[in-house]
Amino acid sequence: MTWTAPPGSRTRHGWNTPVTAPGPENREMLKRFREIQHNPLNFLLQTWQLHGDVVQFPIPRPASYLVSSPQGARDVLVNNHRAMSKRTIQYSTLSLVTGEGLLTADTETWKTSRRQLAPAFHHEMISLATNHVATALNRLDQNWAELTSEGSALIDVDQTMMNLALEITGATLFGSDLTGQVDQLTSATLRALHGVVVRARNPLPMPLAIPTPNNLGMRKAIRELDTAVNAIIDRRLADPLPPGSPIRDMLDVLMDQTLEQPLSRKQIRYEVATFIVAGHETIASALTWAWYLLGSNPEEAQRLQVHPERAALVFDETLRLYPPAWVITRRTLESVEVEGFLIPADALVIVSPWVVHRNERVWPNPELFIPDRFANGAPMLGYLPFGAGPRLCIGRDMARLQGAQILSHISQNWQLSPIHNQQVPVDASVTLRPQGGLPMRLTRIKD
């Protein structure tokens, strides 16, 4: 599937010189301020629908743009990636929790970390990780069997998928058994990320050292995460993998002191925290929404139960409708042209996969859950749940494989049914999560 500009649309080939992008006036922004704060997904979608593929907001510093076309997203993330920085308020605020890890780092720090982490995400390592997923799923089966020993049970799928994803992340990437810490770690993660969102949406955030209620909560959550991260590192230092071990997890790669540029203890902490916070939260979000969509589309749930190989299609379509990373931001280092429009240096550029994935030029009936869209693979343009370009998520292949494995296994053994037919509201936090959790009825599928 490919994307082409519709007749009469403005493309880079239609301009002799780039022009200024259109956008809403101050009055419209003031009227929609509450929506910006409380329903940013709808705000971004309607802004694109009202004003077009490249929109300039009436904000003087920094000049801010929304880019919503598939080609525009490619211009930002691929074609002009060297002219883009991650030094935005969103990533800077997140780095208060994770440090300058792979997700938030810029330029040389990112290049060093990416190069060093690459061996941990080779295909052989990803295949070996399926054993850890199987172990975690076996433990989940045992827990659910106890819950349903006298019939069905009501569970919070959101919390369950968070715990499962964290357990798998600990075993796969760090060789650590986190089963006794999942409740504490997921709680600390959610509280830290809540603090990130509050700060990012505050036009005048107070320095973290100022004891506001939000800052105090953030600092406490960060201390708890630091304690857990340092314990993971210390356990490996006390019990390292044997020299020359053919099986190397991410932590072993991070701590390799034989490299030309070995990472410092601080940088190792940053990367471990990044994958604990961002890594497990992302796959947990996708799995939660997959069960919501399957519960809302019982015919697709039945097809998955009969044909478990469809799990990859279900996972990919879930990532289209509910991309965990629903907004990607960049700051321009120099003026660039995007879809024929001029974006100046030092501007904030927003690319929202939530909006791009609802473009009818790429996705007919975009609001419908249709896993078969991916029967022939994803389109080259218009699908970016893991970003695009050099900053494409390093864990993409692992996340897709693990997501499909989890969906396939659970759908063969368990039925998750909605307890009501109402649409679940979306909490657009650092990732997309259901407001108030996702209660569903758990029933064992009889052999």
Model feature map: region roles:
Residues 2-21, 85-91, 109, 125-285:
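Cytochrome P450 heme-thiolate monooxygenase catalytic core
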Residues 2-108, 112, 134-139, 179-180, ...:
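N-terminal membrane-proximal hinge/A-helix region immediately C-terminal to the signal-anchor transmembrane segment
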Residues 2-9, 17, 48, 137, ...:
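Cytochrome P450 proximal C-terminal region
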Residues 32-52, 308-341, 360:
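Conserved cytochrome P450 K-helix E-x-x-R motif and the immediately C-terminal K′/meander segment
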Residues 240-247, 301-309, 321-340, 350, ...:
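Cytochrome P450 fold signature focused on the C-terminal beta-domain
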Residues 282-305, 397-412:
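Cytochrome P450 catalytic-core helices
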Residues 351-377:
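Conserved cytochrome P450 K-helix/beta-meander segment immediately N-terminal to the heme-binding cysteine loop
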